[in-house]
Amino acid sequence: MQTSPLLTQLMEALRCLPGVGPKSAQRMAFTLLQRDRSGGMRLAQTLTRAMSEIGHCADCRTFTEQEVCNICSNPRRKENGQICVVESPADIYAIEQTGQFSGRYFVLMGHLSPLDGIGPDDIGLDRLEQRLAEEKITEVILATNPTVEGEATANYIAELCAQYDVEASRIAHGVPVGGELEMVDGTTLSHSLAGRHKIRF
């Protein structure tokens, strides 16, 4: 079926979103045009503004429309002395929702991957090293993903922290709450056993 060129362009543009295939893009385009043109206009305007105005925080590299994000500019966060290193801005949102961390962050925007030509400077480790040298950081919490690349990245950063006498710790990976042991993979179970803690009464 031949569609209008502009409609085809709209569907192709929507396919840049993760998980959106041809059918989903078609459904989204038709929904916006048939039922929610005002919503479509609002989406277009907000998307245009976001693409032109949102950049990276000068300190932690997360997304923000300011030079320094709200977390990094918070005096209480600075006094905490902890920096949590994550792979993406989405990880910050996940950790913030727990309400268990009151320090600042550093976003790598990826991980080390020599096979893909991604080295330390490509993920901002030169900037992290500068912060280790200049700021009063007491602990770096490594919250990279539990993948081969994530572990390699965490180990590299831990060695970097040691050069500046800054404590480095790795977040625990283990059995999910409500999970059954027989369904957990061996690597996760190994991490759980290694990271066990004593029960005190």
Swiss-Prot record:
List the disulfide bonds in this chain: none
Query: Could you cite one Gene Ontology molecular function of this protein?
Result: zinc ion binding
Q: Which Pfam families match?
A: RecR_C, RecR_HhH, RecR_ZnF, Toprim_4
Annotated Toprim domain residues = 81-176
Entry keywords, A to Z: DNA damage, DNA recombination, DNA repair, Metal-binding, Zinc, Zinc-finger
Zinc finger (C4-type) boundaries: 57-72
- GO BP, one example? DNA repair
InterPro entries in the record, alphabetically?
DNA_Rcmb_RecR, Rcmb_RecR, Rcmb_RecR_Znf, TOPRIM_dom, TOPRIM_RecR
UniProt record similarity statement: Belongs to the RecR family.
Q: What does this protein do?
A: May play a role in DNA repair. It seems to be involved in an RecBC-independent recombinational process of DNA repair. It may act with RecF and RecO.
Alphabetical list of NCBIfam families matching this protein? recR
Task: Report what the protein is called.
Answer: Recombination protein RecR
Q: Say which species the protein is native to.
A: Escherichia coli O6:K15:H31 (strain 536 / UPEC)
